[in-house]
UniProtKB/Swiss-Prot annotation:
Pathway: Mycotoxin biosynthesis. One of its GO terms (molecular function) is hydrolase activity. This is Alpha/beta hydrolase ucsC. It comes from the Eukaryota. Homodimer. Keywords: Hydrolase. Its EC number is 3.7.1.-. The keyword Ribonucleoprotein does not apply. Alpha/beta hydrolase; part of the gene cluster that mediates the biosynthesis of UCS1025A, a member of the pyrrolizidinone family that acts as a strong telomerase inhibitor and displays potent antibacterial and antitumor properties. These compounds share a hemiaminal-containing pyrrolizidinone core fused with a gamma-lactone, giving a furopyrrolizidine that is connected to a decalin fragment. The polyketide synthase module (PKS) of the PKS-NRPS ucsA is responsible for the synthesis of the polyketide backbone via the condensation of an acetyl-CoA starter unit with 6 malonyl-CoA units. Belongs to the AB hydrolase superfamily. FUS2 hydrolase family. The keyword Nucleus does not apply. It holds the Pfam family Abhydrolase_6. It comes from Acremonium sp. The active site is at residue 258.
């Protein structure tokens, strides 16, 4: 059967193609303690392709073993390794519940409990972090008539006293999640580095994300700016009520990855946002989806020659053979609040910056043709060229750069790497340390933060070489010669 979502033949390291980005996403968190190489390799070697139950059980077993290690390490007073174990357990529990959208309704409660275990493990890790981590609740009142208010759960990462920037208040970065990320996972994309650089980091589960979707049942909103408005209001209130945090409400920036990049850009139109980093964002969700679907099938549906039932039937039948297709439509349906696969595809049309394609455009945005014309703050936009058939920078990244008409060229920056090690995978999976370097370098520049070069100074004689010589001059030569001789003798 024709695959609904196509992939290029290259850059696949696992037998089942869909696992490539998902597992790269996991191993990519290793530099910040979210994964262990040996644990990862052992699991992947035994993982059956195209099997959601196998995925769930393997990751659950690994998560429980890792959590137990964390408890043992914590009891022994070994805080650093315990923190790492808790972070890994949190990430493995996230993976264990990842397939929840395609599980029967009777098992949804079971998978929600696993999600809470992921949160609890993260909380245990947070208690052992160098910086302060605070659980927060962000009030959000949807603008629709009689829509119930909801509390958005969040984590606020605050730099410790010795990590704060000298001579100024603490800037804050809002980190927006993507389609299926959890805010605990966002730690590896922003909060792992931010506090150490003097930034406060706020992550949260917005509508259609994390607990806000799973427990409150609130679907995603195409007008992400109304959510960011509530988040900004919360930050201002928090800063006023907690002067000890020393937050700079005039130095708030925002970032997001993939779909989160789209939401971050919508939020960047608020004048309280002073800079935006949009990581591999989407310009028009529907157009991107159509580029990855068989045109011979979708063309008659788009022109009403074929009803929704044909699309629904094709998706359901293909989902029986392919977990990736089943997950994509199940996750998207829950996220959007769509009643059927065809409706989910139709709902994608609202996720665009083209104002002439959205229902509320004329009411809210005057004569502008593109929402991005409202963004005036400095913007760093990235693309992912590592798999041209999966994500198309020319359809999203390039279109976004063209339509940021009111951002001066000197305040726009573009980065489209190709190799995965350089950030060529979607959401920069596998290159998160490099992403954070580029992100905070841009924010430092635009927010006027000067750090100065701090070259590493080596202390003479600090390390002892072979035969007791220091690693300087003759001591270094002696150490190298001794090591070389040892290796040579061992080989022969």
């Amino acid at each position: 059967m024709y695959p609904f979502f196509t992939y290029s033949p290259g850059r696949h390291y696992f037998e089942y193609k869909w696992y490539n980005l998902e597992l790269l996403r996991l191993i990519g968190s290793a530099p910040y303690g979210g994964c262990d190489a040996a644990e990862f390799l052992e699991l992947v070697a035994s993982l059956k392709p195209n099997d959601a139950d196998e995925w769930h059980h393997k990751f659950l077993a690994l998560a429980e073993r890792t959590q137990a290690k964390g408890e043992q390490m914590s009891e022994a007073g070994h805080e650093a390794v315990a923190r790492g174990a808790y972070l890994r357990a949190s990430n493995y529990f996230r993976c264990a519940q990842y397939m929840f959208p395609i599980m029967p309704a009777a098992r949804q409660g079971e998978f929600l409990k696993l999600y809470h275990r992921s949160i609890r493990s993260f909380e245990q890790a947070a208690e052992l972090m160098e910086h302060r981590v605070e659980r927060v609740s962000i009030p959000f009142q949807p603008p629709e008539y009689r829509a119930p208010a909801v509390e958005l759960p969040g984590w606020l990462h605050l730099p410790a006293a010795h990590q704060r920037l000298s001579g100024r208040k603490t800037p804050l970065l809002i980190c927006v999640g993507g389609a299926d990320s959890t805010q605990e996972e966002l730690y590896f994309l922003s909060a792992a580095e931010g506090p150490g650089l003097g930034y406060a980091i706020l992550t949260f589960d917005g509508p259609g994300q994390g607990l806000t979707l799973r427990e409150s049942g609130v679907p995603l909103r195409p007008d992400g700016e109304v959510v960011i408005e509530a988040v900004l209001d919360f930050i201002e209130s928090y800063a006023a009520e907690h002067p000890e945090a020393d937050l700079d409400v005039d130095a708030i920036s925002i970032t997001g990855q993939s779909l989160g990049g789209y939401l971050a850009l919508r939020g960047a139109a608020d004048p309280r946002i002073k800079a935006c980093v949009a990581v591999d964002p989407i310009y028009d969700f529907y157009d991107l989806a159509m580029s990855r679907m068989p045109r011979w099938f979708m063309w008659p549906w788009e022109r009403n020659y074929m009803g929704d039932g044909f699309v629904d039937f094709a998706v359901i039948e293909h989902s029986k053979l392919d977990v990736a297709t089943k997950y994509t439509f199940a996750q998207g349906g829950q996220m959007f609040g769509s009643a059927s696969p065809a409706q989910m595809i139709r709902d994608m049309k609202q996720y665009t910056f083209r104002l002439d394609k959205t229902i509320t455009a004329s009411k809210r945005h005057g004569n502008n043709r593109d929402y991005l014309e409202w963004v005036t703050c400095p913007v760093f936009v990235t693309g992912a060229a590592g798999d041209e058939k999966l994500f198309l920078p020319e359809m999203s990244t390039s279109a976004i750069m063209r339509n940021l008409a009111n951002v001066p060229d000197e305040h726009k920056e573009l980065w489209i790497p190709k190799e995965w090690s350089e950030g060529g995978a979607q959401a920069k999976s596998g290159a998160w340390p490099l992403l954070q370097h580029r992100c905070f370098k841009f924010l430092d520049e635009k927010l006027g933060i000067s750090r100065g070069a701090k070259p590493v100074q080596l202390k003479t004689g600090f390390v002892k070489g072979v035969n007791g010589h220091g690693l300087t001059n003759g001591g270094l030569n002696g150490a190298l010669n001794g090591a070389t001789n040892g290796i040579t003798n061992g080989v022969h």
